[in-house]
Amino acid sequence: MAIPEVMDTGAASVEIPFSGLETEPILKLDYAAGVQTKLCDIDLSRQIPVAIMQHGDTVEYFWDSEGGTVFAHTAIRPDGSVEEQTVPRKFYPNLYDEYAAYDIWGTACKRLDWQTGELTTASLPFVQLDSVLGAVGSRVLLTRIVSDTPLPEGEGHEDMRDAVLQNSLREYDLYDPATNTIEKVFDEPYYPEDHNESKSYLGYCGDKLYFGVSHTDGVSALSRKNTLVSYDRTAGIWQEECSADAQNGEDSGFWPFLQDGRLKLVVLWRGKDTLTLYSIDNGARYEVPYEEAGSDATGNRNFPIALTDDGRILVTDGYIDRSGVAASRYALIDLGAYLAGSREYTAVEMWTE
């Protein structure tokens, strides 16, 4: 069973269990109280979840309908009241702050104001947007394709498009939605020189941007080594922070953990029964035992889920039965103790039907 993703604020986390039912709850876990409660139910027979966001104490659940005929968001207030509001145009938010939600894609930045509900659109000051990576303070890190000729669009032009990309750059920029301006950070060849290497953005801390680099064996496409690297925006310098090699033939991705929007902890490697973690704060590497989640609702212990504002970490702690469906149970533990290998948890009081 997959480890669930949660929308985390440092004080609480919000999640949709996705247990395969037509009606699912939206659950909130208050870290200080150590209690999980239900905010409301959502109807997945008519809603396709898009995103969960939060401003102040209000949780916003964005969704659209089958076929994309309706775009809406459900505001869940701290008093338990729920208000459904439609959005007049296609809106798939990929970022948010305390003022608005943003849908940055194609040639436009759409902004939905939390206070007024007004949806505005600004044309982006560049072309050939490649990806939106995440917030860096009040700005957005994104990539765009820089080429001598425009990229061919539409079906049937795949070979021509690939030929253009072979001689193009991927430029990393910081975009400011408030001023609609960009600042170049760095660029690199669109296709890496080493075709057995792939790079993914994990987060930022201070002036450094952090990336996970996976090295495959070129045959099975499985990662054989994961390396955490950083780029110092002020000095313009790349640095290798830490790396982890495969053992016993396993494959692993990266799991970044943020606090106040900044990268604090990274799972470099997920082995059969051990996690390799790296702390951004002190530059130390840790080996922490855990139990994989089994298809028969066994295991699922000690895998990190989120960091809390009070110096603890939320981890998996087995399963609970929720209306006949196995759901992850959570526990809280001091971060330092967790990294030292302790399992002296404080159990979370989980919501059940």
Which role does the model predict for each range below?
Residues 3-6, 45-55, 87-98, 126-137, ...:
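Repeated scaffold domains used in trafficking and secretory/extracellular systems
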Residues 8-10, 86, 99-100, 163:
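The feature marks helicase ATPase cores and/or their adjacent C-terminal helical subdomains
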Residues 2, 13-16, 61-63, 102-103, ...:
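Residue position within the beta-strands of beta-propeller blades
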Residues 6-9, 17-21:
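N-terminal low-complexity, Pro/Thr/Ser-rich intrinsically disordered segments
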Residues 9, 33, 55-56, 67, ...:
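Acidic/polar residues in short coil/turn loops that connect beta-strands
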Residues 133-136, 141-156, 160-172:
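Solenoidal tandem-repeat scaffolds enriched in leucines and small polar residues
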Residues 59, 81, 100, 140, ...:
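Generic structural signal for coil-to-beta-strand starts
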Residues 20-44, 65-87, 106-126, 156-190, ...:
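Surface-exposed loop/turn elements that mediate protein-protein interactions on large endomembrane-trafficking
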